[in-house]
């Protein structure tokens, strides 16, 4: 669950967020919609603990973000454009992520890739992936560790109609599995 309570963010003299308040329960998809530059991405970064709000409090699964330095939210994250090693295949990118976390599970990597509609046996490098395939791989990265919360900034960015429909289906499956999902979009 994500709880945002009276969160404000000011950078220098610019008010980025002012008194933001909402809750996103498990098994729920919540949306943040706004124009470019309206603070959507900064809100997502605050929820993930990358940026400390000027005031207010954010909790993920009952833990206050930023209070306990050892607490890292159990969150899968896509912030704007997912990062990949372009010369590696999608499978190899996920394998590298798993090795960094000391949790290499080849079965899980294959399962996650298939879940988002990618072929784990495809040898093509990520630099040759379409934008839609990269977005799917970004979602695969976000769900690798089976997080309780997903924070997705512009997950439909650059997708065609079919890609948007497929991404929505993946998100509905994750919602039905009890994930709290924050989606930011225009």
Question: What do the predicted segments below correspond to?
Answer:
Residues 33-35:
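The feature captures the beta-strand-to-loop junction immediately N-terminal to the Walker
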Residues 56-71:
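Conserved ABC transporter NBD signature motif
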Residues 161-163:
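Helix N-cap at the start of a conserved alpha-helix in ABC-type nucleotide-binding domains
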Residues 95, 106-121:
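Conserved ABC ATPase "signature" region
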Residues 48:
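Helix-to-loop junction immediately C-terminal to a conserved catalytic motif
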Residues 150-154:
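Catalytic Walker B motif of ABC-type/P-loop ATPase nucleotide-binding domains
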